[in-house]
Amino acid sequence: MKSVTRCIALLGGSFDPVHNGHVALADYFVALLKPDELRVIPAGNPWQKHGLQASGQDRMAMVRSAFSTQKVTVNIDQQEILRPSATYTIDTLRAIRQELGPHASIVFLMGADQLQHLNTWQEWQHMFDYAHICAASRPGFAMDAAHIPTEVAQEFTRRTGTPEQIRTTPQGLAYLAPNLAVDISATAIRAALQRGERPTSQLPLGVLDYIEQHHLYKS
């Protein structure tokens, strides 16, 4: 098999707003995998979520600010924002695999809250046909059915790989980072902002500045 040419880490999300939990997830896996690029993908119209509060343009600007100090090349991918129909991660992974070719390692990064609902995602098991999946787990959470759906736990156990294997193979492996998850809720942040609070411990300073300058998340 031809050797892997490069490693691209993908971080998708609504980022409404992007917060320190997202940044911590990226920081951890950038240090672990040393990818050649971190590609951040703000969601367009996610099929599971109703009514993003900030516009695509505002969310892109906040993401750009939040990830400006990364020790890796960061690119903001607009494909989901530009997609006119409902957004499915499987479609994004197919498109990126087609773009990068068969010999790139593609690593999809996932937060603990996403992992808990992965079995409801469109064609979730086929995501491994196009990428590796690296996920955070909440502090103290074991890989068990109480916290992670049984079929997801089984798939992760069956596919578990080392960081080195993930970095040097194209797709198909899984990695769970225990005790990584930072318990920050975008919903709670929006509620705090609507009350006029400044959640400085939960948001990158540049993101909070942007929110205040553009009067986002006001009732």
From Swiss-Prot:
Secretion signal span: none
Family: Belongs to the NadD family.
SUPFAM superfamilies for the chain: Nucleotidylyl transferase
Role played: Catalyzes the reversible adenylation of nicotinate mononucleotide (NaMN) to nicotinic acid adenine dinucleotide (NaAD).
GO molecular function per UniProt: ATP binding; nicotinate-nucleotide adenylyltransferase activity
Pathway connected to this protein: Cofactor biosynthesis; NAD(+) biosynthesis; deamido-NAD(+) from nicotinate D-ribonucleotide: step 1/1
Pfam families xref list: CTP_transf_like
Gene3D superfamilies assigned: HUPs (3.40.50.620)
InterPro entries: Cyt_trans-like, NadD/NMNAT, Rossmann-like_a/b/a_fold
EC number(s) on file: 2.7.7.18
GN (gene name): nadD
Transmembrane segment boundaries: none
Name of the protein this chain belongs to: Probable nicotinate-nucleotide adenylyltransferase
Entry keyword annotation includes Nucleotide-binding: yes
Source superkingdom: Bacteria
GO BP terms, alphabetized: NAD biosynthetic process
Keywords of this entry: ATP-binding, NAD, Nucleotide-binding, Nucleotidyltransferase, Pyridine nucleotide biosynthesis, Transferase
Substrates-to-products reaction catalysed: nicotinate beta-D-ribonucleotide + ATP + H(+) = deamido-NAD(+) + diphosphate
